[in-house]
Amino acid sequence: TYFPAPTDYGEMPLIDGDSLKISSEDDRPVVFVFKTLNDPSQGRISFIKVLTGTIEPGMELVNARTRKSERMAHLYVMCGREMTEVGHAYAGDIVVVPKLAAETGDTLSVSGKIEAAAFKFPNSQYRIAIEAENRGDEEKLFTFIDRACEADPTMRIERDEETGQTIISAVGEAQVSVLLNRLEERTKVEARTVPIRIPYRETIRRVASAQGRHKKQTGGAGQFGDCYLRVEPLLDGTDYEFVDEVVGGHIPRALIPAVDKGVQETMKDGVIAGYPLTGIRVACYDGSYHPVDSNEMAFRTAARIALKKACEDADPVVLEPMENITVTIPESYAGAVMGDVSGSRGRVTGMDTNNRGETVVTATVPYAELVDYATRLRSLTRGTGDFTMEPAGYEQVPYDVQKHLVEFYEESRAQGR
């Protein structure tokens, strides 16, 4: 009595440019998943709207995205927190279906070939790392937020394997704040936000050589390893290359892999600031061994000593990740945005106007300067700006930045952190 009948809508446009006629009499139902939640009693539940036709419990429909069949075992009508089971749903009805694998925005139909236009969600531009106050609650924290992300497509959660951080992407700070409050209320897990760690790298800029010698005598069988390494920068984008140049049996062939292993172990922690070493060729060109005391452990240790010495003489530098950003803003804010890019050690690479009359600025900026860019851009443009970014490789950091990173690393080591 308050809204027009669904059949009055006529035809609904589809993604492929075709249209779908709305009718309750159609024996080929089409439904659209517009929300997904995790209910405490029912588990995963999907809110669906019947676009056309009629559905009943036990019916199987095919997901257009996954091409997999999904069975709607039960249909419920939601009223507040109460769920009432029903025997059918017609075009225009909204019902709840438990335990579907479908995600928000999916279309299900008899053929699986019909796909309604999904929602266009705002970009999740705000990124922040979170951690539980109690380390033992980390898994519970991740599980809760992962389920929250299923219900809210504007949020994403990921684990950075390199830094070990759990990172949330959201529309803004308020969304994350509400999520953490809900986490504490429902699970008693306290969590806090922390800055995102930047995945810096280290490399070298010139060729250098060094000897690594490890000798240890403890009364019984000792340890002896001796190798000469030459390091040189790789300029073709390759991360690492190991070359065996030993001749004359100065190091037995069976122990060469131990040298390689010792080198790679050292590369994980870098040589000046604690970041992984990359873009380096290492050649083992000489050494010596003891027929009794030489073993794999001794040569791994010798390789670590030699690599650190060689890299310290090879002009080591710190690299930082760069991002290509595309910022869309009203023309009146172009100057402020480009000034901010320049002040963030970035380079403006282009400026254009899109078909809506907005200014589009492209730039390359260090990732370290972009971790709070969503908040900064909102302030610069009074909430009217939008941006996207994608990785653009690594570049050497300025001298003052490297000095700060090295000093911080040395201070942390001195304090045992």
What do these predicted ranges mean?
Residues 1-417:
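Structural and coupling elements of P-loop NTPases
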